[in-house]
Swiss-Prot record:
Enzyme class at the top of the EC tree: transferase
Protein name: Xanthine-guanine phosphoribosyltransferase
Superkingdom to which the source organism belongs: Bacteria
Gene it is expressed from: gpt
Subunit structure as annotated in this protein's UniProt entry: Homotetramer.
Binding site for 5-phospho-alpha-D-ribose 1-diphosphate: R43, G44, D95, D96, L97, A98, D99, T100, G101, G102, T103
Length: 163
């Protein structure tokens, strides 16, 4: 399926919204702990993991690195670049999004005893996570703040006039 067919909507997330949503996720996770530490799925889980680590006073943060996206194209294979030892008992896994479930499924296989939490979840990925904050439709591209930037736009009065 092409990108144009797959994503019909865009959901832009600001830094402030991501922080609010990660903090809301922290509230949900607080009663489910304590945790030995956090395993952040890089790269998308790094920022939410930092917020959650602060809110839950967790000082041990590991990463698991899996490559699966090139802009809006999700590759068919997931490449594990870095993993962690064990089965995940007592650990909290954090990612930004459970989309098709490919990454979540792979991490679940590696760390079946961990608690898996994401800030956002789509219908296909939702069954693979234990805790999340916001569900987004499968045909929506979530535009995270690290994938965008604020740019200066020339005021209309200063733009060249079209005849």
């Amino acid at each position: 399926m092409s990108t144009a067919d797959r994503y019909r909507k865009v959901f832009p997330v600001t830094w402030e919204q991501l922080h609010r949503d990660a903090k809301a996720l922290s509230w949900r996770l607080l009663e489910k702990g304590p945790y030995k530490g956090i395993i952040a799925i890089a790269r998308g889980g790094l920022v939410p993991a930092a917020v959650i680590a602060r809110e839950l006073d967790i000082h041990l943060v590991e990463t698991i690195c899996i490559s699966s996206y090139q802009w809006q194209e999700q590759t068919s294979s997931h490449k594990v670049l870095k993993t962690v030892e064990g089965r995940g008992e007592g650990w909290l896994i954090i990612d930004d999004l459970a989309d098709t479930g490919g990454t979540a499924r792979l991490v679940r296989e590696m760390l079946p005893e961990a608690h898996f939490a994401t800030v956002y979840a789509k219908p296909a990925g939702r069954p693979l996570v234990d805790t999340f904050i916001t569900e987004v439709s499968q045909d929506t591209w979530i535009l995270f703040p690290w994938d965008s930037e604020v740019q200066y736009v020339v005021p209309l009065v200063n733009q060249p006039q079209q005849s």
